[in-house]
A protein has these predicted regions:
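C-terminal "post-core" interaction segments
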Residues: 1-152
Length: 152
């Protein structure tokens, strides 16, 4: 038996579908958008909505992405209301993400990776252990340099 807490249905072919969602209608942009520079910091734990946001920023060239390749895919992901199944022989509980999200992004061909930052920052285990946030430091350096160019 499948257990879910979301409005997910199954059609006659065995495919699951999302029944309703309040934001499936046309989204109208605000009349006063932010016009400054946008910097998005990413790392290997950038999944789900944050990876989707990074994909849109990169595809639409709306900001500079700084950091490490995202853990989530460029084209989308499988997530949403998790379906729980208890395997009959072992009794092991498994959770399956039934919803496949496709992002409205520029096609990069046969691309199977996460979002690659515009400025790639190399992290190492020492930085992580010492809590040395090299991604933040790189982003702040870029922002500082960009501001110097503006005020020269």
């Amino acid at each position: 038996r499948w257990i879910t807490h979301y409005p997910i249905g199954e059609d006659s072919t065995g495919k699951f579908y999302w029944k309703v969602h309040p934001q499936l209608e046309l989204q109208i942009p605000k009349s006063n958008p932010f016009l400054g520079n946008v910097y998005v910091l990413t790392d290997g734990f950038t999944f789900s909505a944050t990876s989707e946001f990074s994909s849109i920023v990169k595809s639409n060239k709306r900001g500079l992405i700084v950091g490490v390749e995202t853990g989530g895919g460029y084209y989308g992901n499988n997530s949403g209301g998790m379906l729980r199944k208890i395997l009959p022989n072992s009794g092991i509980k498994i959770y399956i993400p039934p919803i496949k999200y496709h992002m409205a992004v520029k096609d990069l061909g046969n691309y199977t990776r996460g979002v690659i930052p515009d400025t790639l920052v190399t992290e190492n285990i020492h930085d992580i252990v010492l809590q040395n946030d090299v991604v933040l430091k790189a982003a702040l350096e870029i922002i500082y340099t960009d501001n110097l160019k503006l005020y020269k």
